[in-house]
């Protein structure tokens, strides 16, 4: 860890992947590494676990390729060469009843930066999916709470969504939303991975669209793959609003790019601008 700041200083554009053990200590070190500038992390193969080494090899190659492609295109701003058709802003807007956020690669750095300026001003529940193993999410929830100045914890089965709630999907469990007599509540399950992920954004987005209808704001931040694209489509169908991080400020423009290229996003913004836009939208402004 002590070498990371020096590495970043010597090679600011370097992509660093942290290999971590699936332990509490490993999770703490990994979250620190991400805060110090590591681009992503990968869990070390578990001794004796069937297929563990093969899974590790495949995931490592995928991450190297994704980060390498991003590094190669950063200076070219390739997003500008990909036509993005933004959704028109709605003529009439209602104040969202919940804020949904999804992130993967780059998310442990992007999420605190996105939420710190605005979280305390948002009364509605904030629900977050960050692709992480089960041993990592409790540590990340604590770090996120310290960064944003608002209580944040892992979601639990049966949680009722109330004002001021900030819930992080636990590792290895999908977080879904359902209506209940008290309003809306959380359901957790270990269903099949979606888009190779558990937790995944799509189950949250799709069930929240059914539970909240049009009163949703969905934000998709930096991440590899296309998790969140199908769910963003459901949110749009229900009348909700979707905004995404731009390529220039994303570590990997997979998830937000997939949503934007599908035509579901009404705004594609740099991270700082996206944060302020989300705040205005959560306050009920047309933005």
Language-model regions: role of each:
Residues 1-287:
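Conserved acid/base catalytic micro-environments in cytosolic active-site loops
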